[in-house]
């Protein structure tokens, strides 16, 4: 919103429309207009006026939120001499509006906290606030709100205050932490039975624990700690207060992760939590699930904090295994949501024990894990009145999947075979109800793959028992038994006499709608593992494939069946493969031809993606072993299918989703036959370029990268592939030149640089000598700022591989030429690239991208270290040394230290470490 400042009346109208306009488009227009206002420089003055006038809750909330947003994102717009008056104004507003609405108070508290963090001239802000407001009981709620959000905002991603300022703030808050604790004690004394005040106290205390600035020795003997456990032990504590106290204890436990340096507080928390067992049982008796969940969170956090002690000194001191008993008590609760809270701890315990690899230690924990697994098997039981198959996508279905993953990770402590046999014996010896049987089969399916299938009579017995289950058992039992059979495909492979009965059993399932998808998945597993044995059943698989749509399968299950069929097909004699592949593809090709011939009409789907996906999976997994000189058996089939794929692509050229599936299908066809697809190269490239000039589907760039990968080393294909690249670059560059082109088209960026990287890998000299290399590199430099994981990774990989070409494979005859060409490129754009990479790391990209950037810098350094040293020095000179408010972002020493660390690095990871530390100064 440039130009004149809007009137307050106009702003009020927009706010009213945002909240009260019955027309959604009116709300949308108001939202857009107010968003533009918030981004403008007028927002400061307007929000201040709205807060002064206090016309209604909505306008005050908008103004408070705007203030917070402006301070977070546009603080540089204000002159330094206005900061003090802004602070005073905000403090006046929060005092005047303290009774209007809690959400407004929170927004203003955040604004004040963010201001304090960015205003170095406001020294000792905690002391100032406490002195100003602590004696007025009516001001305590908003004072506590400010003191709660202040530590939370220190590490906020919205504020780029830099590591130097952050360190200064944390030291300042640590210095005044005792003042805050004293204030909280005073608030407790004044609160009496005021529950809201106690909740604010606990929230504030938790926030200071989370920042890690409270003195643990001081806190160990503090009355606030005793009060927390008192509140948690009392049966009459309300749910809200209980949750606030629980959160605070969890924060305290998290804060003492380094137990040795916080021993007195660790001991107090340890003893305090152990006293809560009785209160937990009381909450269970009262069926108060909220409190039960809170206790379980506390018990889990206790175990997480003392994990090292539990593993290293089990049963001694802080390694006391009563901690695990508490979690197992929670695992016994009938609601599965309770035990689920502790899953992360059990994962971590398993990980630690796996690394220690100590049989004696493992034996101590075995009984605990066995008890946990029994509890989990119980939790996995469906309701006795459940009808049909188990749901996999609802909350309970997802819980069962997490149980399955956890069991797989912990089974080594019990022993897969021992556990499998125990579970089976419960089915064999008793006559449990169906829901118990189903849950046991579910756990058995989770561990079946980790049981050694070699000469294992129990596994054989289980397999035999399952395939002879009567059809009268509950559908859910049949469903899970089918899943178990699929997981036991290794056993079938070792005992091929079972193949026929297993396939017979699975075919019955395939013919029943509720079981069809599970049966298809199991057949897919059997095909994957028993490829050689399944070759004799190929005709049966072909029959299934021909009548695929007569089974009630999910699209994924149908594709899985075809994948299994293709894997078996690849094991047939070469002379049979061509004919069988043609048979396998014929149904899908006929369907595509039918869609091409029919006129578009209402009610009839003309979507070819189902058939394209099926062809893609067939090509992807038909990978026979072909000797050099032999014609690929799939070549003829793919050449026959090409006209149908080409026509489908042409018909749906404007539809990105369908074109993407066409390209995917062609990609796997090309990969399937490799250089055997040479006859398709010319017509395919011509069609790609023609369609791409009209419709910029990025999947064409990806398909281009596949063609370069397959043919880039063929002398006769290089010029044609370069022509393709140059033709594709023209519309690509035009697309990216549009406003916000990079941000709006990350897939195009990703696929463009995949294509360019393939060229560098397969035919570097062809690209380096071309006209297009400099524009591509310029776009790569521009794209380094793009905060998109895949796109950025592709850009960095291109830059790394491009520069590496100048030093790689120095024994090859084209080395000197490559070295010279890279030298020319770098002399033209090297300084710009280094400056951009440094700027990008400091101001644009998240930390996870730094290893990729470090690799690019490392490669530049390998080409010419002295020149790189100069480029880096120039780049560092261009960085801002102070914030707009005068806080030091980076000192001269920090700049010279970073330069030295990078330029003297002997390994790439040293560059990465230096970058990590340096970029924190700007975050």
Curated annotation (Swiss-Prot):
The modification N-acetylmethionine is found at residue 1. GO terms for cellular component: annulate lamellae; cytosol; nuclear envelope; nucleoplasm. Keywords: Acetylation, Cytoplasm, Nucleus, Phosphoprotein, Protein transport, Transport. The modification Phosphoserine is found at residue 74. One of its GO terms (molecular function) is small GTPase binding. The keyword Cytoplasm applies. Pfam families: TPR_TNPO3_IPO13_2nd, TPR_TNPO3_IPO13_3rd, TPR_TNPO3_IPO13_4th, Xpo1. The modification Phosphothreonine is found at residue 896. InterPro entries: ARM-like, ARM-type_fold, Exportin-1/Importin-b-like, Importin_beta-like_NTR. It is found in: Nucleus envelope; Cytoplasm. One of its GO terms (biological process) is protein import into nucleus. Interacts with (GTP-bound) Ran. Interacts with (phosphorylated) SFRS1 and SFRS2; leading to their nuclear import. Interacts with NUP62. Interacts with RBM4. Interacts with CPSF6, promoting its nuclear import. Importin, which transports target proteins into the nucleus. Specifically mediates the nuclear import of splicing factor serine/arginine (SR) proteins, such as RBM4, SFRS1 and SFRS2, by recognizing phosphorylated SR domains. Also mediates the nuclear import of serine/arginine (SR) protein CPSF6, independently of CPSF6 phosphorylation. The nuclear import process is regulated by the small GTPase Ran that partitions between cytoplasm and nucleus in the predominantly GDP- and GTP-bound form, respectively. This is Transportin-3.
